[in-house]
Amino acid sequence: MIGKEVTVQDFVLKLSEIQPEVLPVDLLCEEELPNEQETEEELDIERTVFKIVAPCGCSCCQVKLRLFVNATDSGIRTFQELLFRDLQLLCPECRGNCKHGGS
């Protein structure tokens, strides 16, 4: 550095000395883009409309909730498992009695 002010020309970076594991990356690697036909096949996933009737998750409420979803077969099975195990739907009235965030 010459002078009292630092300029960009005063900095010389030698990454190989600082971080020897840093190697240049070939951005033109051997990747291939999918064909248009493969892309169209992925978009043609068959979905079906399902009507779900489930009781309110609150123990004191007898309301039946109706929910309509558009899902794949595997998606609706996953949702069904959640409803049977970890997830409970609430009606608007019971939701108003609960605090958000699990409190």
From Swiss-Prot:
PTM statement from Swiss-Prot or TrEMBL: Highly phosphorylated.
One GO MF term attached to the UniProt entry: protein domain specific binding
Keywords assigned: Activator, DNA-binding, Early protein, G1/S host cell cycle checkpoint dysregulation by virus, Host cytoplasm, Host nucleus, Host-virus interaction, Inhibition of host innate immune response by virus, Inhibition of host interferon signaling pathway by virus, Interferon antiviral system evasion, Metal-binding, Modulation of host cell cycle by virus, Oncogene, Transcription, Transcription regulation, Viral immunoevasion, Zinc, Zinc-finger
Gene3D superfamilies on file: 3.30.160.330
Motif Nuclear export signal: positions: 76-84
Residue window of motif LXCXE motif: 27-31
Zinc finger (unnamed) boundaries: 56-94
One protein family per Pfam: E7
Record-annotated membrane-spanning stretches: none
Assigned GO CC terms: host cell cytoplasm; host cell nucleus
Biological process (GO), any one: symbiont-mediated suppression of host innate immune response
The keyword Isomerase is assigned to this record: no
Location relative to the cell: Host cytoplasm; Host nucleus
Region feature E7 terminal domain, mapped onto this chain: 1-45
InterPro entries, sorted: Papilloma_E7
Record note on domains: The E7 terminal domain is an intrinsically disordered domain, whose flexibility and conformational transitions confer target adaptability to the oncoprotein. It allows adaptation to a variety of protein targets and exposes the PEST degradation sequence that regulates its turnover in the cell.
Family under the similarity heading: Belongs to the papillomaviridae E7 protein family.
Biological function: Plays a role in viral genome replication by driving entry of quiescent cells into the cell cycle. Stimulation of progression from G1 to S phase allows the virus to efficiently use the cellular DNA replicating machinery to achieve viral genome replication. E7 protein has both transforming and trans-activating activities. Induces the disassembly of the E2F1 transcription factor from RB1, with subsequent transcriptional activation of E2F1-regulated S-phase genes. Interferes with host histone deacetylation mediated by HDAC1 and HDAC2, leading to transcription activation.
Subunit structure: Homodimer. Homooligomer. Interacts with host RB1; this interaction induces dissociation of RB1-E2F1 complex thereby disrupting RB1 activity. Interacts with host EP300; this interaction represses EP300 transcriptional activity. Interacts with protein E2; this interaction inhibits E7 oncogenic activity. Interacts with host TMEM173/STING; this interaction impairs the ability of TMEM173/STING to sense cytosolic DNA and promote the production of type I interferon (IFN-alpha and IFN-beta).
Protein name according to UniProt: Protein E7
Gene: E7
